[in-house]
């Protein structure tokens, strides 16, 4: 049986494989544009970066990791940023992918959905399922940022301190990673990569403005076709977490 780290690394590689095949099809059909290729390139690089980060010892791959970071910076300029929330660090991480991925190795509960004034797309809010049982304050937000091609941005806030048990699937153990073969969507694990770079200061400023515009009374969990019935309703006290974020300098 694979460990949690092994499964996460394999899932990252499989996701990179899927995006690599999508990029290959674009190249074969000569349908190249920055809008269609940048999200794929960004996801591929971060998938490998995430998988390599689990290799022990890290000192074996200083050149490769540095190269990946340099290549990623050409695709999307980013900067590290950490803020403090109470006694613990509150870190912001971002992932962009062609589809929303509700399963990223952790269990989440949807507790809010909001139409943002500065965007035509709604933003969904989640908390760790073990927020109350294990005092885990990890949160994430999912929002479509463009529709052609579709790109979904997932922003993670805080760190998981829960002891979530990953679901084992023997499919991973027998899967040979070959980059000239397409893995079906039903086989590919749904992973939202979390690399070690914080979101850009520009996105942080946008998030700050959006949070200020969000009235607690406007939050609702509606019958969205994609998210409906996947998560139970939220309690109003949970949104205070994001209200406190908006007040941070």
Curated annotation (Swiss-Prot):
Q: Name one GO cellular component term.
A: nucleus
Does DNA-binding count among this protein's keywords? yes
Subcellular location(s): the record lists:
Nucleus
PROSITE patterns noted in UniProt: WRKY
In its UniProt record, a GO molecular function of this protein is: DNA-binding transcription factor activity
Tell me, in one coarse class, where this protein mainly resides: nucleus
What InterPro entries would the database entry show? WRKY_dom, WRKY_dom_sf, WRKY_plant
Keywords associated with the record: DNA-binding, Nucleus, Transcription, Transcription regulation
Specify the DNA-binding region ranges.
97-165
What the record says about family reads: Belongs to the WRKY group III family.
Sorted alphabetically, which PANTHER family does this protein's record hold?
WRKY TRANSCRIPTION FACTOR 21-RELATED
Per its database record, what is this protein's job?
Transcription factor. Interacts specifically with the W box (5'-(T)TGAC[CT]-3'), a frequently occurring elicitor-responsive cis-acting element.
Protein name in UniProt: Probable WRKY transcription factor 64
- The organism encoding this protein is Arabidopsis thaliana
């Amino acid at each position: 049986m694979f460990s949690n780290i092994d499964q996460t690394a394999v899932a990252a590689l499989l996701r990179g494989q899927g995006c690599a095949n999508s990029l290959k099809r674009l190249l074969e059909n000569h349908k190249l544009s920055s809008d269609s290729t940048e999200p794929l390139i960004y996801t591929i690089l971060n998938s490998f970066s995430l998988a390599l980060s689990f290799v022990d010892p890290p000192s074996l791959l200083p050149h490769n990791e540095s190269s990946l970071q340099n290549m990623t910076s050409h695709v999307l300029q980013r900067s590290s940023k950490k803020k403090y929330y109470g006694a613990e660090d509150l870190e912001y991480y971002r992932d962009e992918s062609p589809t929303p991925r509700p399963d990223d190795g952790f269990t989440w509960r949807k507790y809010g959905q909001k139409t943002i004034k500065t965007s035509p797309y709604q933003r969904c809010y989640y908390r760790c399922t073990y927020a109350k049982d294990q005092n885990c304050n990890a949160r994430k937000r999912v929002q479509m940022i463009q529709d052609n091609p579709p790109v979904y941005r997932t922003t993670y806030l805080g760190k998981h301190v829960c002891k979530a048990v990953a679901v084992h699937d023997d499919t991973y153990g027998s899967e040979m990673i070959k980059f000239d073969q397409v893995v079906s969507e039903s086989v590919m694990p749904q992973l939202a990569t979390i690399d070690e770079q914080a979101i850009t200061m520009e996105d942080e400023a946008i998030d700050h403005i959006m949070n200020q515009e969000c009235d607690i009374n406007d939050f609702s969990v509606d019958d969205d076709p994609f998210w409906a019935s996947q998560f139970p309703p939220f309690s109003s006290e949970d949104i205070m977490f994001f209200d406190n974020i908006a007040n941070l300098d």
